[in-house]
Protein backbone atom coordinates (compact mmCIF):
# COMPACT_ATOMS: atom_id res chain seq x y z
CA UNK A 1 0.00 0.00 0.00
CA UNK A 2 1.09 3.54 -0.65
CA UNK A 3 1.92 5.59 2.40
CA UNK A 4 0.49 9.06 3.12
CA UNK A 5 -1.96 9.24 0.21
CA UNK A 6 -4.99 10.06 2.35
CA UNK A 7 -6.21 13.66 2.48
CA UNK A 8 -5.90 15.62 5.69
CA UNK A 9 -9.07 15.32 7.79
CA UNK A 10 -9.91 18.12 10.22
CA UNK A 11 -12.77 20.08 11.80
CA UNK A 12 -14.53 22.30 9.26
CA UNK A 13 -17.02 25.12 9.72
CA UNK A 14 -20.23 24.69 7.74
CA UNK A 15 -22.15 27.90 7.03
CA UNK A 16 -25.80 27.83 6.01
CA UNK A 17 -27.54 30.43 3.85
CA UNK A 18 -29.69 31.33 6.89
CA UNK A 19 -26.55 32.33 8.83
CA UNK A 20 -26.27 29.26 11.06
CA UNK A 21 -22.76 27.85 11.57
CA UNK A 22 -21.82 24.40 12.83
CA UNK A 23 -18.72 22.22 12.96
CA UNK A 24 -18.30 18.99 11.01
CA UNK A 25 -15.40 16.75 10.06
CA UNK A 26 -14.20 17.17 6.49
CA UNK A 27 -11.21 17.35 4.19
CA UNK A 28 -12.20 20.94 3.36
CA UNK A 29 -11.66 23.87 5.71
CA UNK A 30 -15.06 25.48 5.18
CA UNK A 31 -18.34 24.34 3.64
CA UNK A 32 -21.28 26.42 2.39
CA UNK A 33 -24.72 24.78 2.49
CA UNK A 34 -28.09 26.05 1.26
CA UNK A 35 -30.25 24.54 3.98
CA UNK A 36 -29.67 23.17 7.49
CA UNK A 37 -31.70 21.82 10.41
CA UNK A 38 -32.33 25.38 11.66
CA UNK A 39 -34.16 26.44 8.48
CA UNK A 40 -35.42 23.17 6.92
CA UNK A 41 -39.26 22.89 7.08
CA UNK A 42 -39.11 19.32 8.43
CA UNK A 43 -37.12 20.37 11.51
CA UNK A 44 -38.76 23.78 12.08
CA UNK A 45 -42.34 22.58 11.69
CA UNK A 46 -43.12 25.48 9.36
CA UNK A 47 -44.32 24.60 5.90
CA UNK A 48 -43.22 26.71 2.95
CA UNK A 49 -45.79 27.01 0.19
CA UNK A 50 -44.65 26.91 -3.40
CA UNK A 51 -46.61 29.06 -5.83
CA UNK A 52 -47.44 26.29 -8.29
CA UNK A 53 -50.73 27.88 -9.31
CA UNK A 54 -48.92 31.01 -10.47
CA UNK A 55 -46.44 28.95 -12.43
CA UNK A 56 -49.18 26.98 -14.17
CA UNK A 57 -51.03 30.16 -15.14
CA UNK A 58 -47.83 31.70 -16.46
CA UNK A 59 -47.18 28.55 -18.52
CA UNK A 60 -50.71 28.60 -19.97
CA UNK A 61 -50.46 32.30 -20.91
CA UNK A 62 -47.07 31.74 -22.50
CA UNK A 63 -48.22 28.86 -24.69
CA UNK A 64 -51.78 30.08 -25.37
CA UNK A 65 -50.64 31.87 -28.53
CA UNK A 66 -49.27 28.60 -29.91
CA UNK A 67 -52.63 26.91 -29.36
CA UNK A 68 -54.40 29.78 -31.17
CA UNK A 69 -52.03 29.50 -34.13
CA UNK A 70 -52.48 25.74 -34.21
CA UNK A 71 -56.30 25.93 -34.20
CA UNK A 72 -56.28 28.75 -36.80
CA UNK A 73 -54.52 26.64 -39.44
UniProtKB/Swiss-Prot annotation:
User: Which Pfam families does its entry note?
Assistant: Ribosomal_L31
The domain of life is Bacteria
The record's GO molecular-function terms, alphabetically, read: metal ion binding; rRNA binding; structural constituent of ribosome
Q: How is the cofactor bound?
A: Binds 1 zinc ion per subunit.
Give the cofactors, semicolon-separated.
Answer: Zn(2+)
Residues that coordinate or bind Zn(2+):
16, 18, 36, 39
Record's GO cellular component terms: ribonucleoprotein complex; ribosome
* Family designation: Belongs to the bacterial ribosomal protein bL31 family. Type A subfamily.
Job description of the protein: Binds the 23S rRNA.
UniProt protein name: Large ribosomal subunit protein bL31
Which species is this record about?
Desulfosudis oleivorans (strain DSM 6200 / JCM 39069 / Hxd3)
The gene name on file is rpmE
Amino acid sequence: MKQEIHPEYHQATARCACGNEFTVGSTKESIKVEICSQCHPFFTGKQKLVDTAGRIERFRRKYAKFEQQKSGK
